[in-house]
Curated annotation (Swiss-Prot):
Stored SUPFAM superfamilies: Glyceraldehyde-3-phosphate dehydrogenase-like, C-terminal domain, NAD(P)-binding Rossmann-fold domains
Residues binding NADP(+): 13-16, 41-42, 162-163, 316
Top EC class for this record: oxidoreductase
Keywords linked to the UniProt accession: Amino-acid biosynthesis, Diaminopimelate biosynthesis, Lysine biosynthesis, Methionine biosynthesis, NADP, Oxidoreductase, Threonine biosynthesis
EC number: 1.2.1.11
Outcome of swapping residue 40 to D: In strain: C7258
Pathway noted in the entry: Amino-acid biosynthesis; L-lysine biosynthesis via DAP pathway; (S)-tetrahydrodipicolinate from L-aspartate: step 2/4; Amino-acid biosynthesis; L-methionine biosynthesis via de novo pathway; L-homoserine from L-aspartate: step 2/3; Amino-acid biosynthesis; L-threonine biosynthesis; L-threonine from L-aspartate: step 2/5
Binding positions for phosphate per the UniProt entry: 101, 216
Native source species: Vibrio cholerae serotype O1 (strain ATCC 39315 / El Tor Inaba N16961)
Family annotation (HAMAP family): ASADH
NCBIfam families: asd_B, PRK05671.1, PRK08040.1, PRK14874.1
PANTHER family (UniProt xref): ASPARTATE-SEMIALDEHYDE DEHYDROGENASE (PTHR46278:SF2), DEHYDROGENASE, PUTATIVE-RELATED (PTHR46278)
Assembly and oligomerization: Homodimer.
Protein name: Aspartate-semialdehyde dehydrogenase 2
Chain's gene name: asd2
Length: 337
């Protein structure tokens, strides 16, 4: 990558935005000039990037014509407003919010799963980053899907509070400190107390009884696999862990496959770290700061002749958001610029 690119991060002061900055630097993305953008209240804040100090600018006053690629993670409403403006100025926007994910002409991309979909960015100059839980699940399931097909996915997620941003992290920390010191916990970000608790609700409830987070996994899986016939049955749970999401995944395959075959395939797949036997990954011990999807507890389902069980763990802020976006940008500049 000898060519250099002007890159903007919109939502630069949020948890994902700050991690995007780290990942761009760690992966040595070919940045010529970096622009950090946020709302007026964050204007003037500074960050270090490649040995230089970069000042956060007010997005309302920014000239998008300076930028080749923009990574958006400032919330759906702001993406709805600014992504079309940036795209019209010639910027390729990689959006981390859910706003554009279900538009038929916007590609929804996990680089390890459907990299060919990136080509569709030319439709509107926008690429959507999937939901964190969908990303890690589909990276793990792609080898199985390619080998024997998947009829149905049952998944229960155990999602950390960082999925709700800095407010979620602060609420868990604050509630834990208060409760351990004998004070009542205040609840603002989540529907119930999150400290020492599990909440089977992420996002709002839909008319069918599922939450929006759960339905995201359904819609996104079908779109990314380009397979509307695949059935997905999710339950999404918020747990009192700061970083990292875990998932108990059960799949019914279109043809039987042995767990040993599955493990052999996973072991040979880029982006996956496999744990065999009695060893297994956890959010706290293994996921933090990693860009791989971690898979363990792979076994045949004793109740179904074509069933496979997996335990899937990843850093939701990195692979579930920032790293996936940067990986999309890497493919974009490698194959399309």
């Amino acid at each position: 990558m000898s060519q250099q690119f002007n890159v903007a991060i919109f939502g630069a002061t949020g948890a994902v935005g700050e991690t995007m900055l780290e990942v761009l630097q760690e992966r040595e993305f070919p940045v010529d000039e970096l622009f950090l953008l946020a709302s007026e209240r964050s204007e003037g804040k500074t960050y270090r990037f490649n040995g230089k100090t970069v000042r956060v600018q007010n997005v309302e006053e920014f000239d998008w014509s300076q930028v080749h690629i923009a990574l958006f993670s400032a919330g759906g409403e702001l993406s709805a407003k600014w992504a079309p403006i940036a795209a019209e100025a010639g910027v390729v926007v990689i959006d981390n919010t859910s706003h554009f994910r279900y538009d038929y002409d916007i590609p929804l991309v996990v680089p390890e799963v459907n990299p060919e979909a990136i080509a569709e960015f030319r439709n509107r100059n926008i690429i959507a980053n999937p939901n964190c839980s969908t990303i890690q699940m589909l990276v793990a399931l792609k080898p199985i899907y390619d080998a024997v097909g998947i009829e149905r996915i049952n998944v229960t997620t155990y999602q950390s509070v960082s999925g709700a941003g800095k407010a979620g992290i602060d609420e868990l920390a604050g509630q834990t400190a208060k409760l351990l010191n004998g004070y009542p916990a205040e609840t603002n970000t989540f529907s119930q107390q999150i400290a020492f608790n599990c909440i089977p609700q992420i996002d709002q409830f839909m008319d069918n009884g599922y939450t929006k987070e759960e339905m995201k996994m359904v819609w996104e899986t079908q779109k990314i696999f380009n397979d509307p016939s695949i059935m997905v049955n999710p339950t999404c749970v918020r747990v009192p862990v700061f970083y990292g999401h875990a998932e108990a995944v059960h799949v019914e395959t279109r043809a039987p496959i042995d767990a040993e075959q599955v493990m052999d395939m996973l072991e040979q797949t880029d982006g996956i770290e496999l744990f065999r036997g009695a060893d297994f990954p956890t959010q706290v011990r293994d996921a933090g700061g990693k860009d791989h999807v971690l898979v363990g507890r792979v076994r045949n389902d004793i109740s179904h002749h074509s069933g496979i069980n997996l335990w899937v763990v990843a850093d939701n802020v990195r692979k579930g958001a920032a790293t996936n976006a940067v990986q999309i940008a890497e493919l974009l500049v490698r194959d399309y610029f």
